[in-house]
């Protein structure tokens, strides 16, 4: 039975690797309650979300009906939150649906375009509904990005290498794109050409942003999530790197985001903006 003093949480993508971690984290949070767990995997339907996650029964079966779950979240005295870890192909529609129902989305799924993010921000503002899009929930990644901003003031050459498991659908990663955007806000042009460049194979030197920052994506089994920032100057190389060894590292950021989104009335992009 729903506790009126707890934040009601809908977990979309509850059967995935990140979704299962979210189930465990929310189930263990004293101020939150899982009211719905959604997943499209037919093999999981009807099973207890907690049992699937490995944290014991939470008495919430996995369903494949996001709309009904959002309706359930609107019936609480405390405004509900939807956490989305699904797929790039569906995240825009999921997020827009949550806002339309007055349920505050916390989006960890990457792959949203800049145009889609701007549209969702406008939609959230019109609805006066808080929303969070977080490319990476790790506090360590926020520190990597902040250190990169400091380094970029003194280095004109930088490349980003992001490495993920081979089941990640989008490339570059949302974290790499966000990091490049943060560097671009410094207002400088990176990687001035020293020679006339020629790629024998298109894309050999990585994807290039408008500010001439190169991003390289690696997808291999055995990886989880990693990002390396390589800064270069005559006579020196400065390297920053963050490695994720377990998805549990994201959960403090997820729980913080669930709590913070209830205080917002617009869309915020990036964990660093709510810390």
Swiss-Prot record:
<feature type="active site" description="Proton donor/acceptor">
    <location>
        <position position="164"/>
    </location>
</feature>
<dbReference type="InterPro" id="IPR022663">
    <property type="entry name" value="DapB_C"/>
</dbReference>
<keyword id="KW-0457">Lysine biosynthesis</keyword>
<dbReference type="GO" id="GO:0051287">
    <property type="term" value="F:NAD binding"/>
</dbReference>
<feature type="binding site">
    <location>
        <begin position="174"/>
        <end position="175"/>
    </location>
    <ligand>
        <name>(S)-2,3,4,5-tetrahydrodipicolinate</name>
    </ligand>
</feature>
<dbReference type="InterPro" id="IPR023940">
    <property type="entry name" value="DHDPR_bac"/>
</dbReference>
<protein>
    <recommendedName>
        <fullName>4-hydroxy-tetrahydrodipicolinate reductase</fullName>
        <ecNumber>1.17.1.8</ecNumber>
    </recommendedName>
</protein>
<comment type="function">
    <text>Catalyzes the conversion of 4-hydroxy-tetrahydrodipicolinate (HTPA) to tetrahydrodipicolinate.</text>
</comment>
<feature type="active site" description="Proton donor">
    <location>
        <position position="168"/>
    </location>
</feature>
<dbReference type="GO" id="GO:0005829">
    <property type="term" value="C:cytosol"/>
</dbReference>
<dbReference type="InterPro" id="IPR022664">
    <property type="entry name" value="DapB_N_CS"/>
</dbReference>
<keyword id="KW-0220">Diaminopimelate biosynthesis</keyword>
<feature type="binding site">
    <location>
        <position position="165"/>
    </location>
    <ligand>
        <name>(S)-2,3,4,5-tetrahydrodipicolinate</name>
    </ligand>
</feature>
<comment type="pathway">
    <text>Amino-acid biosynthesis; L-lysine biosynthesis via DAP pathway; (S)-tetrahydrodipicolinate from L-aspartate: step 4/4.</text>
</comment>
<dbReference type="Pfam" id="PF01113">
    <property type="entry name" value="DapB_N"/>
</dbReference>
<dbReference type="GO" id="GO:0019877">
    <property type="term" value="P:diaminopimelate biosynthetic process"/>
</dbReference>
<keyword id="KW-0520">NAD</keyword>
<keyword id="KW-0963">Cytoplasm</keyword>
<keyword id="KW-0028">Amino-acid biosynthesis</keyword>
<feature type="binding site">
    <location>
        <begin position="108"/>
        <end position="110"/>
    </location>
    <ligand>
        <name>NAD(+)</name>
    </ligand>
</feature>
<dbReference type="InterPro" id="IPR036291">
    <property type="entry name" value="NAD(P)-bd_dom_sf"/>
</dbReference>
<keyword id="KW-0521">NADP</keyword>
<dbReference type="Pfam" id="PF05173">
    <property type="entry name" value="DapB_C"/>
</dbReference>
<dbReference type="GO" id="GO:0016726">
    <property type="term" value="F:oxidoreductase activity, acting on CH or CH2 groups, NAD or NADP as acceptor"/>
</dbReference>
<dbReference type="GO" id="GO:0009089">
    <property type="term" value="P:lysine biosynthetic process via diaminopimelate"/>
</dbReference>
<feature type="binding site">
    <location>
        <begin position="13"/>
        <end position="18"/>
    </location>
    <ligand>
        <name>NAD(+)</name>
    </ligand>
</feature>
<dbReference type="InterPro" id="IPR000846">
    <property type="entry name" value="DapB_N"/>
</dbReference>
<dbReference type="GO" id="GO:0008839">
    <property type="term" value="F:4-hydroxy-tetrahydrodipicolinate reductase"/>
</dbReference>
<dbReference type="GO" id="GO:0050661">
    <property type="term" value="F:NADP binding"/>
</dbReference>
<comment type="similarity">
    <text>Belongs to the DapB family.</text>
</comment>
<keyword id="KW-0560">Oxidoreductase</keyword>
